[in-house]
Curated annotation (Swiss-Prot):
It comes from Streptococcus pneumoniae (strain ATCC BAA-255 / R6). Pfam families: MTS, PrmC_N. One of its GO terms (molecular function) is protein-(glutamine-N5) methyltransferase activity. Methylates the class 1 translation termination release factors RF1/PrfA and RF2/PrfB on the glutamine residue of the universally conserved GGQ motif. Substrate binds at residues 182-185. The lineage of its organism: Bacteria, Bacillati, Bacillota, Bacilli, Lactobacillales. S-adenosyl-L-methionine binds at residues 118-122, 141, 182. Belongs to the protein N5-glutamine methyltransferase family. PrmC subfamily. This is Release factor glutamine methyltransferase. Its EC number is 2.1.1.297. PANTHER family: HEMK METHYLTRANSFERASE, MTRF1L RELEASE FACTOR GLUTAMINE METHYLTRANSFERASE. Transmembrane segments: none annotated. Gene3D superfamilies: DNA helicase RuvA subunit, C-terminal domain, Vaccinia Virus protein VP39. It is an enzyme of class 2 (transferase). The keyword Transferase applies.
Amino acid sequence: MKLAQLFSNFEEELIRQGEEAESLSFVYRSLKNLSFTDFIFALQQEVTTEEEKQFVEDIYQQLAAHKPAQYIIGQADFYGMHLKVDERVLIPRPETEELVELILTENLETNLSVLDIGTGSGAIALALAKNRPDWSVTAADISQEALDLARENAKNQNLQIFLKKSDCFTEISEKYDIIVSNPPYISREDESEVGLNVLYSEPHLALFADEDGLAIYRRIAEDATDYLKDSGKIYLEIGYKQGQCVPELFRKHLPEKRVRTLKDQFGQNRMVVVDDGQD
């Protein structure tokens, strides 16, 4: 049997399991470190060993059990970086890259201080530190396991960020030019909308929040003035249903600030910005 036929068989099964067939080739290529051209060539070769067949089947079994491809290969790409990821942290999403791009585009000043609340793998903090090496970036998370992984990623990227174990602002004592957060924002009532590979594998602490998904936003809104410099800004990622309720929270608690809601590349409400600009 050629490798292409073996792949076809397992891909059909993955589709029946509700998973993306393309994940099989993505994981295989990543683990084998094959270019696309080399992979196409490999597909035409006969599977001559039980070891090779078992290798493909092992990948299939993990995907069929709804394990995300990024966890299988132990890596996710984010803003030009290869970040280590596993079940300790949420897998960085493309939408969050848009949040990073927005921050970099709107803030060209040097020597700014940034606080990333709920840093997880460190994706946002590291992307900002990489592209603004003169900025001072603090990455906070309630999970020590997440901070341990963020520290690994910082070391692997040869970047300096300050890591702090903190439940929102509980262990924060400074004021910052920029506060950014991609907090857990999915309501428990919306659990049925979450894909099985996310629901079964990614940390629920980083996915779900009380108060219809608004709990962390409320805490940030209520306390931000104590940790934000006078001309400081807040950048948030939000769920697509939260384009009205999250801005309302920040207008209530920071009435002197402008609050904007921006859409992502898919046309969904995805970012909220709190700043001193004029509407």
